Amino acid sequence: MELTGVIAQSIFDDNAADLKLSWVAGLEGADRAFDVDFAKEATSAADLVGHLNLIHPNRIQVLGKPEITYYQRLSEENRKRQMGELILLEPPFLVVADGVDPPPDLELRCTRSSTPLFTSPISSAAVIDHLRLYLSRISAPRVTMHGVFLDILGMGVLIMGDSGLGKSELGLELISRGHGLVADDAVDFVRLGPDFIEGRCPPLLQNLLEVRGLGLLDIKTIFGETAVRRKMKIKLIVQLVRRNDGEFERLPLDSQYLDVLGLPIHMVKIQVAAGRNLAVLVEAAVRNTILRLRGIDTLRDFMDRQRAAMQAEAASHSPQGRLL
């Protein structure tokens, strides 16, 4: 997993409010990070954080009430040996959860070794789940794509095309028809799972849509709260093409896809020409995609129907068919 720039300080700052974290020791270790080789070998966030485990000392160690109880039952010699082995390998930080006070000797050892020690009143299981989700998100593959990302009929749709084809104008028309804006111009996509990619708007461009001749429009202010979305999963890409595009197929026999972060996303191409109602065409493409996801393929059904008709006609013209 890629965790460049992820240090104890940034993790604390991003999660302190949600987990009610307090930094009680090891303030000098604010720049402590995951071991590079360990992070590269990790296949998921579950490898990066968990309950106290001396076999995997390089991950974030979370100590709940059972772990602290076990620690306090150890002899002083065993405490020094086990914690010494753990801290020697420099875990990113330790978290004492369940509202338990960290043992004084553990706090002192963290201070001397500059190992960050956090406390949280939240249960250790909840702390682990939250940190795993956080690490999954910040280490997930991501890319920024150019276009207008919309929520159309509950489906995330990215409208792409060359400059000057009217992507933003089309987006404005769709918003006026009751659909929602996620992002304009630059869309940040993150692959959060094996089969879905989430798109968001960069904070700087939140709620804004640029239309030639009108400038920047604040969609939330103009159309209201329901006209914007914070995030959507991308399911369809609409590629706007010029009328003289020689690669355009009027009736494509095979579905078209565009690779986004290693995941094929269904794509349709729409020609831009005077008099064409692009908003209606995009809505129809979305409805057709919804049917395809439900297993209904209109083109395939038509081809099956045509094949059956041709076979019936061929049978009627055969000698055996005429005898019948």
From Swiss-Prot:
Give the encoding gene's name: hprK
* A Pfam family that the UniProt record links to this protein: Hpr_kinase_N
- Listed NCBIfam families: hpr-ser
- Organism superkingdom: Bacteria
Q: Give residues annotated as binding ATP.
A: G161, D162, S163, G164, L165, G166, K167, S168
Q: Which cofactor does it need?
A: Mg(2+)
Which enzyme class? Answer: transferase
Q: Where does Mg(2+) bind?
A: S168, E210
Instruction: Show the GO MF annotations.
Output: ATP binding; magnesium ion binding; phosphorelay sensor kinase activity; protein serine/threonine kinase activity; protein serine/threonine/tyrosine kinase activity
What is the name of this protein?
HPr kinase/phosphorylase
Please tell me what else the database record remarks about this protein: Both phosphorylation and phosphorolysis are carried out by the same active site and suggest a common mechanism for both reactions.
Q: Which reaction does it catalyse?
A: [HPr protein]-L-serine + ATP = [HPr protein]-O-phospho-L-serine + ADP + H(+); [HPr protein]-O-phospho-L-serine + phosphate + H(+) = [HPr protein]-L-serine + diphosphate
Presence of the UniProt keyword Acetylation in the record: no
